Design a protein with these regions (language model features):
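N-terminal pro-sequences and low-complexity stem/linker regions of secreted or lumenal proteins
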Residues: 2-670
Length: 670
C-alpha cells in the first residue's frame, strides 16, 4: 500500500479528520417523508470496505451477539467456541485478545490467510482458526480503538447477522455485491467463484488492462440498472486496490467511451501513490452539493483507506466520515439517502458464529428450497463468516440492532425492492435465507431525535505514532473479553420458528417455520469424532423433518437465527416430548407430552430467573402446559427441562419470540 508519509497523510486527510458541525446538524434532520415507504429513498450509497470480521471490529459493542453470547457453539473439546485450539496435539487454546492501538501497531498488521475454505472436514467444527490463520486471528478492537465506528453504531443501525457471501477472499465476495453471484448461479464454475481472479490491473485505469484476460461472461447488476433507466455510478480514484470487479466483465473493458465504462470505470484523478481518498470525497461532495448524485452509488476506496489489515482502520474511519460529511453538506439530499457500510470478507479474523450453509448433499442435512448454484468442489460454499455492516440513514437512527440474516446479495435485493430491477443471478437458497435489508428501517415513523457522532480528530495522529510499536501478540495471561454492558433496541424480525424432537433409533427433528422468511438451522453433536454437523433450511410457511444419526447417548445443539437455540441430551428412546409455540401476546406456551405408561416428574428452570424452578408432573399418556409471558424480558426466553428419573436428560429451549414490533436485545448479553 502507499507509504504512510506523516506530512503528506495529514495534509491529504485534513478534510476528513474532523467531523464538522454540518454533519452533526444533519443527523437531526428528519427523513423526507412523502409516502412513508421505501419509495421515499431517492439515493442509495454503498461503501464496501476490506477484510474485517464482525467480532474483530464490533464484538464488544453492547447488545449485539458478540463476545458475551450466552449460548455459543461448543467445540468438540466441549469448550465454548471462543477457546480456539492451537492444534498440533496440544490442549493449548487462544482466547480473543485486544488489538490495543495505544500500545501496539495493531492498526497495521499483515493480512492473514483468507483463501477459500476448500475442505469441509477442516472447517466443519469451526475450530481451525488458529492453525490456519495464526494466533492473530483472535485479535479484536474496542471502542477505544475504533471510536467513530462504535459511535456510528450507537447512532444508527448495526446488523449483527450480516455474512460474507463466500467463505473466501475479496474477489468472489465483491462479485456477489455487483452481480448477485461469483459465477456458479450463472453457470460459470471457474476458479473466480471462490478465488481472486483478475487481470492484475489493480487500478481504475483501463489502459492497464491485459487484453488476453478472459472476461467474465454473465450480466452485472449495474448493466441491469442501466437498461432499466436507473442512474448509477462507481466513485473511485486511480488507485482502487483492484476492488472494482466491473473491470473483469467484457462490457467494461476495451472502448472506454460507452456509457457503462463512463459510469463503471471512470476515475477521479490524483496522485496515485499519495491518496487517502480525499480526491474521491471531494468529487462525491461536489455531486451531492450540485444535487447530481445518482440513484445508486458504489464507492471503492483507495488502498490506504480500504481497511485491509495493512491499511489502518483510523484512515478508513476518516474516509467514511468524509463521505458522510459530504452527504450532510446538502441536508435535502441527506434526508432522502441510505448509506450502507459493509465489508467484503473477514480476512483471516475470527468470528464465533458459524455461517449458515445449505445442505447440498443428503449427508449435510436437508432443505425445502433448491440449493442449485451453492456448491463448489463438492462443498457448500456460502455463506461466509459475519462481517460488520451498518445502515446509516434518517430511517435507521436510534442505535438499533438488526439480527436478520443478510449477505451481500441483500444489498442488491434492497435495490430490487426500491427500483424494481430484478437480479436473476441470486440463488433460491439465498433468497430464502437472507433478507433484503428492509427490516433495518422504519419508513413509516422514523426516529427523528438528534444523535451524536464524534469527530475523528486525533485518530490518524495516534496511528502514525504507533507505527514503530510492536505487533500485537497473545498475552501471557489470557482472559475472555466482555462486551460493554447494556441493551439496545432491536428491530422487528420476520422469524417465527419452532422445533420438536422424537428420539427412537435416531433423533428425528421437525422444524416449523411460520414466519415470513426462510431459516437455516445448524445441528451440532457434542464430543470428539461425532457425526455432523447438519444443516436444515426451511422456507417460510413450511415444515421439515430430518433424522440425525447418533450413538445411544446423544448431546445435540441446534442454532438458528436471532439466538434460536435448542439442546437435547439423553440416552436411548424418550417418551417425553416438548412442544414450544409462541402465543398471540408474544409469550411462550410449553406443552409437555408423555407418551409413556408412567408419570414423569420434571423441573423447568428459567435462565433469566435463577432459583425460580417449576416442578411439574406429566401424567402417563397425557400432557401438561406451562405458559411463559414474555413482555418483561423483551420476549426472550431460556428454559431448561430436566426429569427426576433420568439425571442426564435435558431439553433446553432458548431464543426470542418475534411479535412484529420493536423489542430489546438479549438481556443475557447485557
Amino acid at each position: 500500500m502507499p507509504k504512510l508519509d506523516r506530512r503528506l497523510f495529514l495534509k491529504g486527510a485534513a478534510s476528513m479528520a474532523a467531523l464538522p458541525v454540518t454533519l452533526r446538524e444533519a443527523l437531526a434532520i428528519p427523513a423526507a417523508r412523502r409516502t412513508g415507504t421505501i419509495q421515499d429513498v431517492q439515493h442509495v450509497v454503498i461503501l464496501m470496505q476490506e477484510n474485517r470480521s464482525f467480532d474483530h471490529y464490533l464484538g464488544c459493542l453492547p447488545g449485539v451477539r458478540g463476545f458475551s453470547d450466552p449460548r455459543p457453539l461448543l467445540l468438540p473439546s466441549g469448550k465454548p467456541v471462543f477457546h480456539q485450539p492451537v492444534g498440533g496435539g496440544t490442549e493449548d487454546v487462544v482466547l480473543p485478545f485486544r488489538f490495543d492501538t495505544a500500545s501496539t501497531r495493531a492498526e497495521r498488521v499483515a493480512s492473514l490467510d483468507h483463501s477459500w475454505k476448500a475442505q469441509w472436514n477442516l472447517w466443519k467444527n469451526h475450530d481451525a482458526w488458529v492453525p490456519v490463520k495464526t494466533p492473530l486471528t483472535m485479535g479484536y478492537f474496542t471502542r477505544a480503538d475504533i471510536p467513530f465506528y462504535y459511535a456510528l453504531a450507537d447512532a444508527f443501525t448495526v446488523c449483527d447477522a450480516y455474512h460474507a457471501s463466500v467463505f473466501g477472499p475479496t474477489g468472489p465476495n465483491r462479485l456477489f455485491l455487483f452481480s448477485g453471484t461469483s459465477g456458479l448461479a450463472a453457470k460459470h464454475a471457474g476458479p473466480q467463484a471462490v478465488e481472486n481472479v483478475d487481470d492484475g490491473n489493480w487500478s481504475s485505469d483501463a489502459a492497464g488492462d491485459h487484453p488476453d484476460f478472459a472476461a467474465f461472461p454473465w450480466t452485472t447488476y449495474p448493466e441491469r440498472l442501466e437498461k432499466a433507466g436507473v442512474s448509477w455510478k462507481v466513485y473511485q480514484e486511480r488507485d482502487n486496490f483492484g476492488d472494482n470487479p466491473l473491470s473483469c466483465f467484457a462490457p467494461f473493458r476495451g472502448d472506454q467511451n460507452n456509457d457503462l465504462c463512463r459510469k463503471g470505470r471512470a476515475f477521479i484523478d490524483g496522485p496515485e501513490e499519495k491518496s487517502f481518498g480525499q480526491n474521491l470525497v471531494a468529487a462525491f461532495a461536489k455531486d451531492v452539493a450540485g444535487d447530481s448524485l445518482p440513484q445508486v452509488s458504489w464507492i471503492v476506496a483507495p488502498t490506504a483507506a480500504s481497511e485491509h489489515p495493512e491499511a489502518p482502520p483510523s484512515i478508513g474511519e476518516a474516509f467514511t466520515a468524509g463521505i458522510l460529511t459530504a452527504l450532510a453538506s446538502n441536508p435535502a439530499v441527506w434526508a432522502k439517502t441510505v448509506f450502507i457500510l459493509n465489508y467484503d470478507e473477514n480476512d483471516g479474523f475470527f468470528d464465533h458464529m458459524p455461517p449458515p450453509v445449505p445442505a447440498t448433499k443428503p449427508h449435510f442435512g436437508a432443505s425445502t428450497v433448491a440449493t442449485d448454484g451453492e456448491e463448489y468442489g463438492g462443498v457448500p460454499f456460502g455463506l461466509g463468516p459475519r462481517v460488520p455492516a451498518m445502515i446509516v440513514s434518517p430511517w435507521s437512527k436510534g442505535g438499533w440492532v438488526n439480527s436478520e440474516v443478510f449477505d451481500h446479495t441483500s444489498v442488491i435485493r434492497f435495490l430490487e425492492k426500491r427500483f424494481g430491477v430484478i437480479e436473476p443471478n441470486i440463488t433460491p437458497w439465498r433468497r430464502a435465507v437472507t433478507g433484503d435489508l428492509t427490516s433495518a428501517f422504519d419508513f413509516q415513523t422514523p426516529d427523528d431525535k438528534p444523535v451524536m457522532v464524534p469527530g475523528v480528530t486525533g485518530l490518524v495522529e495516534r496511528m502514525m505514532a504507533s507505527a514503530k510499536l510492536d505487533e500485537p501478540a497473545v498475552p501471557a495471561q489470557q482472559s475472555l473479553p466482555r462486551q460493554e454492558s447494556g441493551q439496545r433496541p432491536a428491530r422487528p424480525l420476520p422469524y417465527r420458528l419452532a422445533m420438536t424432537d422424537k428420539v427412537g433409533g435416531t433423533v428425528e427433528l421437525t422444524f416449523e417455520n411460520s414466519g415470513t422468511t426462510g431459516a437455516c438451522f445448524q445441528v451440532v453433536s457434542a464430543g470428539v469424532m461425532q457425526p455432523g454437523p447438519w444443516s436444515f433450511t426451511v422456507e417460510a410457511g413450511k415444515t421439515l423433518t430430518g433424522d440425525v444419526t447418533v450413538a445411544k447417548s446423544y448431546d445435540l445443539s441446534v442454532h438458528g437465527p436471532n439466538g434460536f437455540f435448542r439442546q437435547l441430551k439423553g440416552s436411548g428412546p424418550s417418551a417425553l416430548r416438548i412442544e414450544a409455540k409462541a402465543d398471540a401476546k408474544g409469550g411462550l406456551l410449553l406443552k409437555l407430552i408423555n407418551e409413556g405408561d408412567k408419570a414423569v416428574d420434571v423441573s423447568i428452570a428459567d435462565g433469566y430467573r435463577p432459583g425460580a424452578d417449576l416442578p411439574l408432573t406429566v401424567p402417563a399418556k397425557g400432557h401438561v402446559e406451562d405458559k411463559r409471558p414474555g413482555e418483561s424480558l423483551g420476549h426472550w426466553y431460556d428454559l431448561s427441562v430436566t426429569r427426576a428419573d433420568q439425571p442426564g436428560w435435558l431439553r433446553r429451549l432458548a431464543g426470542h419470540v418475534d411479535t412484529g414490533k420493536p423489542s430489546i436485545t438479549d438481556p443475557m448479553i447485557a
